[in-house]
Amino acid sequence: MKVSEFQFDLPEALIARYPTKERTASRLMHLATTGLSHLQFTDVVNLINPGDLLIFNNTRVIPARLLGQKASGGKVEVLIERIIDEHHVLAHVRASKSPKEGTQLLLEGKVEMEMVGRQDALFTLKLLNPEPILEILEQYGHMPLPPYIDRPDEESDKERYQTVYNEKPGAVAAPTAGLHFDDVILKQLRDKGVNTEFVTLHVGAGTFQPVRVDNILEHQMHSEYAEVPQNVVDAIAKTKTAGKRVIAVGTTSVRSLESAAKAALENGTALASFFSDTDIFIYPGYKFQVIDAMLTNFHLSESTLIMLVSAFAGKENVMNAYQEAIAQQYRFFSYGDAMFIEKNQD
């Protein structure tokens, strides 16, 4: 299967560079097995039934971008990919020349780091300040907006590039389907009898990496840390037994749940809790084990995420839906509109 089969041309004007004024003010495309319809996000309450289980990703985006210079004076930009411990991180480092081991960095005029190792494209940096890294980032870091938003981060992004139910710090990109939910709509869903649970997947910067091969089977997926606790496994079993639906909010929730299912299949067991790195790559032909419907935003052309959605709802259905979204001027990507998709697999 070729990457080019997932290509579409998007007018620049349809890239959402700012969120809507209210979280729930986005539009919602409903891609059902019978066709598609155009709704408002608030209509999602009518699409989810009592007894259905909504599963969210409760990761918290850390202000992971730091700007500054090397001791030599050269400009440098650090994007933290993963926190190792309170004083060590794995990071992407952009500079005119890659820093050598022992190179010291002064970031945001206050943060001192030293390059102590390298893992492929990532650098291991040691924080020299006495405070723990999370405290430093909350004080000095910039929100790591995706490259296509193409503007400096603003104070408002600290709230809006974050779900209202975020809990566990560690992501460097938001689980964007969740950005549409506010406390009011969550209460409406719970009052209706919809059940909710939370998984964790710390979204890495790799989520924005383009697929650089022609044949998708040759693509090496980036790795991210995911958690599916036992209470989520139990809630899924209860939902399935009752004949209700498991609905994932976002591709990161999908990947967490399907990673747990894949591990269970490999171990020859029933679905079990999962606390591990995952590099699961879902593309057409994949048979979903857990989810019956999903909420997601509109994704980049030729990305692994549009491949995942195509695996869930059928490639032709998804690519046609994207053309319709462009014709109807939906807003795309992280701060854009959403889709509610029902599983459509042979």
Swiss-Prot record:
S-adenosyl-L-methionine is among the record's keywords: yes
InterPro entries listed in its UniProt record: QueA, QueA_dom1, QueA_dom2, QueA_sf
Pfam families in alphabetical order: Queuosine_synth (PF02547)
Pathway annotation: tRNA modification; tRNA-queuosine biosynthesis
Single annotated GO MF: S-adenosylmethionine:tRNA ribosyltransferase-isomerase activity
GO biological process, one term: queuosine biosynthetic process
Entry EC number(s): 2.4.99.17
GO CC annotations, alphabetized: cytoplasm
Keywords per UniProt: Cytoplasm, Queuosine biosynthesis, S-adenosyl-L-methionine, Transferase
The keyword Transferase is annotated on this UniProt entry: yes
Catalytic activity: 7-aminomethyl-7-carbaguanosine(34) in tRNA + S-adenosyl-L-methionine = epoxyqueuosine(34) in tRNA + adenine + L-methionine + 2 H(+)
Location of the protein in the cell: Cytoplasm
Root EC class: transferase
Transmembrane portions of the chain: none
Domain of life: Bacteria
Biological role: Transfers and isomerizes the ribose moiety from AdoMet to the 7-aminomethyl group of 7-deazaguanine (preQ1-tRNA) to give epoxyqueuosine (oQ-tRNA).
Similarity comment: family membership: Belongs to the QueA family.
Quaternary data: Monomer.
Stated name of the protein: S-adenosylmethionine:tRNA ribosyltransferase-isomerase
Natural source organism: Pseudoalteromonas atlantica (strain T6c / ATCC BAA-1087)
Gene (UniProt): queA
